[in-house]
């Protein structure tokens, strides 16, 4: 699918949704509409408060839009979050109109959808039911998945509140997998292509883990959990 961006460069965000809604398509970035049968123009207004997507595929066309309530945030990080959300929603709405398909997770594509529900509960003071309704309404998530998302976020928030200020979690990234999945968004490599890197990586990992332990002890921090990941469960 040819992708034309106007006013932004959120390639990864749009690619995720394109692969979700049109799994047979592959992205090709263009500077103008050349009349290709598979094409999407995704626009973001100069003010950052409105996005529009014009989509064409299989002889059909569709349009989707998303508008921000109020002015965009002045904080750069929040501005990127909100404008990227607009871009994704406008593309999703156009794709949904064209295909008639709404995936169970709606317009959500990341690996931690519970973060959205958790942020909503912290900002509003409302509970998991309200969070589920928000996720369902805002991102087109199915009622069952929205309830699961809110429940997970609620439990995570309870655990977060139970932690002491000096409690930390240690993440150990494993950048190798038996194979690399087509949909993978992690910085990982297949074992077949990176076999020679595994031994030096493990050596460096041992030294870094020991150093992290010493630093935690010096700072009076307590490691309450280790997370080892970065690849698929088959790693």
Where are these regions (language model features)?
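Conserved glycine-rich "GG(E/T)P / GGGxP" loop and the immediately following alpha-helix
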Residues: 216-235
């Amino acid at each position: 699918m040819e992708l034309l961006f106007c006013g932004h460069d959120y390639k990864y965000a749009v690619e995720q949704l394109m692969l979700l809604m049109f799994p047979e398509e592959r992205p090709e970035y263009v500077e103008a509409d050349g009349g290709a049968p598979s094409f999407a123009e995704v626009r973001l207004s100069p003010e950052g408060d409105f996005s529009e997507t014009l989509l064409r595929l299989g002889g059909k066309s569709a349009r989707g839009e998303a508008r921000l309530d109020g002015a965009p945030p002045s904080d750069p990080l929040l501005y990127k979050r909100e404008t990227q959300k607009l871009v994704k929603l406008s593309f999703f709405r156009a794709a949904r109109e064209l295909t008639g398909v709404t995936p169970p997770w709606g317009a959500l594509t990341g690996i931690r959808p519970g973060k959205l529900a958790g942020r909503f509960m912290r900002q509003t003071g409302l509970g998991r039911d309200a969070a589920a309704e928000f996720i369902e309404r805002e991102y087109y998530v199915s009622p069952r998945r929205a309830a699961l998302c809110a429940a997970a976020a609620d439990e995570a928030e309870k655990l977060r509140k139970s932690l002491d200020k000096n409690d930390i979690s240690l993440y150990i990234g494993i950048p190798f997998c038996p194979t690399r999945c087509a949909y993978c968004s992690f910085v990982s490599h297949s074992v077949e292509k990176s076999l020679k890197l595994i031994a030096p990586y493990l050596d460096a990992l041992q030294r870094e883990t020991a150093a992290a332990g010493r630093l935690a002890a010096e700072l009076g921090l307590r490691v309450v959990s280790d997370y080892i990941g970065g690849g698929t469960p088959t790693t």
